[in-house]
Amino acid sequence: MRSVLTISASLLFGLALSSVAHANDHKILGVIAMPRNETNDLTLKIPVCRIVKRIQLTADHGDIELSGASVYFKTARSASQSLNVPSSIKEGQTTGWININSDNDNKRCVSKITFSGHTVNSSDMARLKVIGDD
């Protein structure tokens, strides 16, 4: 009887751990070095077809000013969407989730994300980390 309870408890614990691990499906899509001068063609290419429903941005090193961002989907018509990003991100700060409306059933793959912006208040280039959630 005791071994049955031990096995049951082990199975329940394993299921609980696997559901927690599955709930946090965030991946670092990449890091972009932000130049000191305003640049509008900073591109993060996604080499593998990846369905991304939303992203977060983190200023890893230095402060960042953003003037825009767009996401491009892997489709025959090269569809894109402008993203509503904050105008500034301080070093160490992470934005809230920014939704990507890929389509009704969220099946289109993201091929690249472009940013316009630059480093502020630093002589070094800031780093913009892009985190995706599928």
Swiss-Prot record:
Keywords: Signal. InterPro entries: UPF0412_YaaI. It holds the Pfam family DUF2541. It comes from the Bacteria. Residues 1-23 form the signal peptide. The keyword Glycoprotein does not apply. NCBIfam families: PRK10154.1. HAMAP family: UPF0412. Belongs to the UPF0412 family. This is UPF0412 protein YaaI. The gene is yaaI.
